[in-house]
């Protein structure tokens, strides 16, 4: 009868104790690239994705965002006299987004590549 009164507890798994603290904290990293030159932008995107895949990271992208087209229309004549002739200028801003899942130290190594002139890089790090 004494054996029936003993409460049964399942054995603890020793492999799980302290497992979370020994692993590096994983972050979601979003790298946003923007440029007026598509050629330079695609080169930097390719270098970033290649570097991330070499380190066997989880990569999503590059995602092509809509191109922003900025228009400016001005008169050619500085004095306002004469025929109304107009100049039309436009600037196209191309944007790419790359998402990674890794630790912050690894991202520093990946983003240390040479960035082409005219390419703006924005890195956003958030917890997963």
Swiss-Prot record:
SUPFAM superfamilies: Ribosomal protein S10
Xref: Pfam families: Ribosomal_S10
Protein source organism: Oryza sativa subsp. japonica (Rice)
InterPro entries xrefs: Ribosomal_uS10 (IPR001848), Ribosomal_uS10_CS (IPR018268), Ribosomal_uS10_dom (IPR027486), Ribosomal_uS10_dom_sf (IPR036838), Ribosomal_uS10_euk/arc (IPR005729)
GO molecular function, one term: RNA binding
UniProt GO BP: translation
Keywords, sorted A to Z: Ribonucleoprotein, Ribosomal protein
UniProt gene name: RPS20
Signal peptide: none
Name of the protein this chain belongs to: Small ribosomal subunit protein uS10
PANTHER family referenced in this protein's UniProt entry, alphabetically: 30S RIBOSOMAL PROTEIN S10 FAMILY MEMBER
Superkingdom, natural source: Eukaryota
GO CC, one annotated term: cytosolic small ribosomal subunit
Family per similarity comment: Belongs to the universal ribosomal protein uS10 family.
């Amino acid at each position: 009868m004494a054996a029936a009164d003993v409460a049964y507890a399942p054995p603890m798994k020793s492999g799980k104790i302290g497992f979370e603290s020994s692993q590096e904290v994983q972050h979601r990293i979003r790298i946003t690239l923007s440029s007026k030159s598509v050629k330079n932008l695609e080169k930097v995107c390719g270098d970033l994705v290649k570097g991330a895949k070499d380190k066997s990271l989880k990569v999503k992208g590059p995602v092509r965002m809509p191109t922003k087209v900025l228009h400016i229309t001005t008169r050619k004549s500085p004095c306002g006299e004469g025929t109304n002739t107009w100049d039309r200028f436009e600037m196209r801003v191309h944007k790419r987004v790359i998402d990674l899942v890794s630790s912050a130290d690894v991202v520093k190594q990946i983003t240390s590549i040479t960035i082409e002139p005219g390419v703006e890089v924005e890195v956003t790090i958030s917890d997963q």
